[in-house]
């Protein structure tokens, strides 16, 4: 008889493992390409970041850093996942529908993909491999 890891892992475990991998990879991507560069080049980001809602460049950069770093880390850990992912979605959707509304599909692609990823995470939750599950069993 052949040993098969596929038969050992249940469908529910596959879903939870898939959610973990999706969360970690999505967060790695947004941290690497958006969060850390904004934080490490704060002064430059302050000058160049758009202010789509007219709340001021300072608020916009702090909100972008908050969502792209703090909320992203919460999503990766699976802590307050839906809440944190929702904040990320507010940023990505404002990028898609306000900042890049007149740009080409190639430019709109990035906020669209992030919106889909974090929308899915908001809908599905963190899964079993998360701090949400450990602390709250949901």
Where are these regions (language model features)?
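A general structural signal for well-ordered alpha-helical packing
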Residues: 46, 70-73
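Perimembrane loop-to-helix junctions flanking transmembrane segments
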Residues: 45-58
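Extended, low-polarity transmembrane helix blocks
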Residues: 1-40, 58-66, 70, 77-138
């Amino acid at each position: 008889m052949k040993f098969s890891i596929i038969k050992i892992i249940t469908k529910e475990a596959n879903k939870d493992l898939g959610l973990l991998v999706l969360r970690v990879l999505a967060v790695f991507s947004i941290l690497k390409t958006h969060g850390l560069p904004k934080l490490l080049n704060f002064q430059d980001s302050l000058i160049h970041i758009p202010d789509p809602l007219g709340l001021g460049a300072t608020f916009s950069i702090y909100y972008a850093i908050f969502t792209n770093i703090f909320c992203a880390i919460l999503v990766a850990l699976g802590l307050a996942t839906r809440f944190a992912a929702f904040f990320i979605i507010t940023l990505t959707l404002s990028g898609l529908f306000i900042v890049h509304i007149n740009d080409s599909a190639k430019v709109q692609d990035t906020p669209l993909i992030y919106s889909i990823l974090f929308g899915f995470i908001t809908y599905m939750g963190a899964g079993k491999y998360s701090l949400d599950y450990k602390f709250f069993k949901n």
